[in-house]
């Protein structure tokens, strides 16, 4: 996995991982439930209330995020998450210091701030407190050490391992054998039968995995610089449309023409005319000025906060964010659209 250059976008993503879904602030004494959701211990205590008196029966409390029953005795201290909270705070503080900068080495872009030297006493205390091996020291502005285990783990957690659902794919689309790639099928390709799940006008496919709670992220590789005179929607001229990447609610219309916008349960960006556009309503929003679309687009879904954000997958610079007034209210799936055999899209395998 290529580690992105350290910057505000990366720190923001790390902070999102270190944020309690109940209070919206950094985790304090985080605990892990049986369903794998984490909360501040005090936040969960307020949510669940006091335990029943000894000898009396108590209904099993449920997870505030997913609703799964989670006995109190199943709570565990999330030590690794506590370490990550400390690290994300440290990165934010150090990034704000005068003279903080990043660098590059060996063609890869890796966090390279000398002020993140793990010889720093505060950082050493953090690692030792949680019984994590202290990384090798470095006195120069070199790369973050390769054996920096918790930071690497945090970065690996930033992407989910997803596949595409061929049952939803428009009949003009071809899904790769590993169910991660999609392209417009060449002439002569056998056409599958129509079904209620399948898009019949929008050349789109949904992910096989949907989300009804939590924070999730996936990356999509695009055909950078491609610019084609075709349409995302069959028989509809949308100009030089090439592809769209984003997320769609389970209720998204599968039949007929669809306007790609949040009111239709679609949050997406579109590569068109050599530019990247956020598919807002009533008109799309141009992103990045004259710069070409990135080769890799990262989609961040924060279900409870109603936020779908898009980042440059290499630099982690924020491209655009859709914000709903509250939780998204339904299961949300990855969405990929493409309209030309020269413009394939591919979900990048997640690393865990």
UniProtKB/Swiss-Prot annotation:
EC code(s) of this entry = 2.3.2.27
Q: In which tissues is it expressed?
A: Expressed in the hippocampus. Expression is rapidly up-regulated in granule cells of the dentate gyrus after LTP induction.
What GO cellular component is one of the record's annotations? Answer: cytoplasm
Does Disulfide bond appear among the keywords? no
Q: Where in the cell is it found?
A: Cytoplasm
Region (Disordered) residue ranges read 98-118
Sequence ranges assigned to domain B30.2/SPRY in this UniProt record: 142-352
Q: Which GO terms describe its biological process?
A: innate immune response; negative regulation of cytoplasmic pattern recognition receptor signaling pathway; positive regulation of cGAS/STING signaling pathway; protein K63-linked ubiquitination; regulation of neuronal synaptic plasticity
Pathway(s): Protein modification; protein ubiquitination
Task: Write down the chemical reaction(s) this protein catalyses.
Answer: S-ubiquitinyl-[E2 ubiquitin-conjugating enzyme]-L-cysteine + [acceptor protein]-L-lysine = [E2 ubiquitin-conjugating enzyme]-L-cysteine + N(6)-ubiquitinyl-[acceptor protein]-L-lysine
| EC class name | transferase
- What PROSITE patterns does the record point to? B302_SPRY, ZF_RING_1, ZF_RING_2
Entry's SMART domains?
PRY, RING, SPRY
Zinc finger (RING-type) in chain: 20-67
The terms under GO molecular function for this entry are: ubiquitin protein ligase activity; zinc ion binding
SUPFAM superfamilies assigned to the protein according to its UniProt record, in alphabetical order: Concanavalin A-like lectins/glucanases, RING/U-box
Keyword annotations for this protein? Cytoplasm, Metal-binding, Transferase, Zinc, Zinc-finger
Q: What does this protein do?
A: Plays an inhibitory role in anti-RNA viral innate immunity by targeting the adapter DDX3X and promoting its 'Lys-48'-linked polyubiquitination. Alternatively, enhances the cGAS-STING pathway activation by promoting 'Lys-63'-linked ubiquitination of STING1, facilitating the STING1-TBK1 complex formation and STING1 activation.
Q: What is the name listed in the Swiss-Prot or TrEMBL entry for this protein?
A: RING finger protein 39
Q: Which organism is it from?
A: Rattus norvegicus (Rat)
């Amino acid at each position: 996995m290529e580690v992105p250059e350290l910057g505000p976008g990366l720190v923001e993503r790390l902070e999102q991982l270190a944020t309690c879904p109940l209070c919206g602030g950094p985790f304090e004494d985080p605990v892990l439930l049986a369903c794998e959701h984490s909360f501040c211990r005090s936040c969960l205590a307020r949510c669940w209330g006091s335990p029943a008196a000894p000898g009396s029966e108590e209904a099993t409390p449920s997870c505030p995020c997913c609703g799964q029953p989670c006995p109190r005795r199943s709570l565990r201290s999330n030590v690794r998450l506590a370490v990550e909270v400390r690290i994300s705070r440290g990165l934010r503080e150090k990034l704000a210091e005068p003279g903080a900068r990043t660098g590059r080495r060996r063609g890869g872009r890796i966090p390279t701030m000398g002020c993140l030297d793990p010889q720093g006493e505060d950082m050493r205390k953090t690692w030792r407190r949680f019984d994590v091996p202290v990384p090798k020291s470095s006195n120069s502005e070199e790369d973050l050490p390769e054996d920096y285990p918790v930071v690497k783990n945090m970065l690996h957690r930033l992407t989910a391992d997803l596949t595409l659902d061929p049952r939803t794919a428009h009949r003009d689309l071809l899904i790769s054998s590993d169910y991660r790639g999609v392209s417009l099928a060449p002439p002569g390709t056998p056409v599958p039968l129509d079904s209620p799940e399948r898009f019949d006008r929008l050349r789109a496919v949904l992910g096989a995995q949907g989300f009804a709670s939590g924070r999730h992220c996936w990356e999509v590789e695009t055909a950078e610089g491609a610019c084609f005179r075709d349409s995302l929607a069959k028989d509809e001229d949308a100009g030089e449309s090439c592809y769209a990447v984003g997320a769609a609610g389970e209720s998204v219309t599968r039949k007929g023409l669809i306007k790609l916008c949040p009111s239709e349960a679609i949050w997406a960006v579109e590569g068109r005319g050599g530019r990247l556009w956020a598919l807002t309503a009533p008109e799309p929003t141009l992103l990045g000025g004259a710069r070409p679309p990135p080769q890799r687009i990262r989609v961040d879904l924060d279900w409870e906060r109603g936020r779908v954000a898009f980042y440059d997958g290499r630099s982690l610079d924020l491209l655009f964010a859709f914000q709903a007034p509250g939780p998204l209210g339904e299961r949300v799936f990855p969405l990929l659209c493409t309209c030309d055999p020269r413009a394939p899209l591919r979900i990048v395998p997640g690393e865990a």
